[in-house]
């Protein structure tokens, strides 16, 4: 195997691994990311579980915080942003 063939093999391998990894981060219908998707045994539908945003993380839509509330706080740049309590 010469250098060009080895490079092409590595490129294909990286592409395949990237595609597999991208499937784990399927966007849900509310703009967030589902932690995992599983096939429901009744009806064969895919059910995505929602994930709450931990304390101190940005909450741009004022929803999905684990604590249930989101307030404006100053970030490291001095800008005011919404963060989960």
UniProtKB/Swiss-Prot annotation:
Its main location: secreted. It holds the Pfam family Omega-toxin. This toxin comes from a female specimen. It is observed that propeptide sequences coming from female specimen have only limited homology with the male paralogs, but the reason is unknown. Negative results: does not inhibit potassium channel currents. Has no activity in vertebrate smooth and skeletal nerve-muscle preparations. The record marks 58, 75, 83 as: Critical for insecticidal activity. Residues 23-48 form a propeptide. Expressed by the venom gland. GO terms for molecular function: calcium channel inhibitor activity; sodium channel regulator activity; toxin activity. This is Omega-hexatoxin-Ar1a. Disulfide bonds join 52-66, 59-70, 65-84. It comes from the Eukaryota. The presence of a 'disulfide through disulfide knot' structurally defines this protein as a knottin. Belongs to the neurotoxin 08 (Shiva) family. 01 (omega toxin) subfamily.
């Amino acid at each position: 195997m010469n250098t060009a063939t080895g490079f092409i093999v590595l490129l294909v391998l990286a592409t395949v691994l990237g595609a597999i990894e991208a499937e784990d981060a399927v966007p849900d219908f509310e703009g967030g990311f589902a932690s995992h998707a599983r096939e429901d045994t009744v009806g064969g539908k895919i059910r995505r579980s929602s994930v709450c945003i931990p304390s101190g993380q940005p909450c741009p839509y004022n929803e999905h915080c684990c604590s249930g509330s989101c307030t404006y706080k100053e970030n490291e740049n001095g800008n005011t942003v919404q963060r989960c309590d």
